[in-house]
């Protein structure tokens, strides 16, 4: 449990999240309009999206399938009967005057995600519901000083709203939950999880309380658009509430916005209750009935999920849960790893992926799909180290050439003459030269200055241009110096 340090003692975070995940679909939830990102304004708007009189919504079957798959991945209950409701409110970018959502009977209920806390323990975050709804359009306020513009390209795009219970106890847990959920959605292909493009948006409901007290008054922070900002927004809002309570003021239930420049939350509007939206079943849409056959079919189509991969990597490949978690955090990296791990030492491969490859990818600002090194060639590099053909230090040089050119490691080693020297006769000759050239250091070593041993190893490596087998050098050198 993480606490907020107030002037009068410690306070607990109580956090629930609402995630709006844009469904990966070529067309909108109730019309055939395209969902292509960054198209010219109002170029992807049908009569249904614009709410022209007499136009009726037609439910997109693919979006329903994506919601069911997501529910199954969340270990949730798929409701065989669900209903679309009208959520009534006025806003300029909502042409219908209401949003089609699911309030009373959502498509998915009672799911869960396990996250790892800062102490290394697993914690279950319960998911209250997942429901389908349509997105609103976009208001643009910076094109003119006199009026706002409306772009309805986004209006009607299908969303999955995923609502947690208030089980989250720190900003870091909230960030970890969103990262894990985003990764899960990407694995099953129901949402691309791109927060920069708005494909995944997060609202945080935050309250604070003393340990053992009832839940406090909550405030909702809308549309947080990055993992980092989730942490910053929750930290600021919780501290703001603690300061108010400790000064004797009450918390007003309201909706607030997070300012990314000042890292503060500001009042947007008073928080509405469900009654304010006057929910009622949409008369233009029949109830959604889902049969067991469809659920079973979609369940069998699910790929291996991140938690399943972690379990496999720890059992089959002997990885730590931490390392396995890093590998599965990106589906393309997990796929790359599996292709290479079947051909070499998986633990050594993991170390090289995390310390060397990830560093180069970050430096080049590219993803693993753009990497010139094939999984097979990466496995060859690991095997060259394993069988003592090259040293670890030389391997780093070979790796850098591979990353830049895409050349196979064995060809680089051959062309550059980088094969490791493991011949005792050759190494003994070099060691004899080093000892002869450093007689004073030898006397100091023999008089008890053991730390000089590293100096002699370095001299041997220098003479062999780092091609000497370091294990063999240590063995032969020790024999010579201790004799």
From Swiss-Prot:
Judged by the first EC level, this protein's enzyme class is ligase
Which InterPro entries does its entry note?
Asn/Gln-tRNA_amidoTrfase_suB/E (IPR017959), Asn/Gln-tRNA_Trfase_suB/E_cat (IPR006075), Asn/Gln_amidotransferase (IPR018027), Asn/Gln_tRNA_amidoTrase-B-like (IPR003789), GatB (IPR004413), GatB_C_1 (IPR042114), GatB_Yqey_C_2 (IPR023168), Gln-tRNA_amidoTrfase_suB_CS (IPR017958)
Q: Does the keyword Transmembrane helix apply?
A: no
GO CC terms, sorted = glutamyl-tRNA(Gln) amidotransferase complex
Provide the E.C. number(s) assigned to this enzyme.
6.3.5.-
- On whether Transport is a keyword of this UniProt record, the answer is no
> One GO molecular function term?
ATP binding
User: Which reactions appear under catalytic activity for this entry?
Assistant: L-glutamyl-tRNA(Gln) + L-glutamine + ATP + H2O = L-glutaminyl-tRNA(Gln) + L-glutamate + ADP + phosphate + H(+); L-aspartyl-tRNA(Asn) + L-glutamine + ATP + H2O = L-asparaginyl-tRNA(Asn) + L-glutamate + ADP + phosphate + 2 H(+)
Which superkingdom does the taxonomy of this entry point to? Bacteria
Q: What job does this protein perform?
A: Allows the formation of correctly charged Asn-tRNA(Asn) or Gln-tRNA(Gln) through the transamidation of misacylated Asp-tRNA(Asn) or Glu-tRNA(Gln) in organisms which lack either or both of asparaginyl-tRNA or glutaminyl-tRNA synthetases. The reaction takes place in the presence of glutamine and ATP through an activated phospho-Asp-tRNA(Asn) or phospho-Glu-tRNA(Gln).
In the record, the note on similarity to other proteins reads: Belongs to the GatB/GatE family. GatB subfamily.
What is the name listed in the Swiss-Prot or TrEMBL entry for this protein? Aspartyl/glutamyl-tRNA(Asn/Gln) amidotransferase subunit B
Organism (species): Rickettsia typhi (strain ATCC VR-144 / Wilmington)
Tell me the gene name. gatB
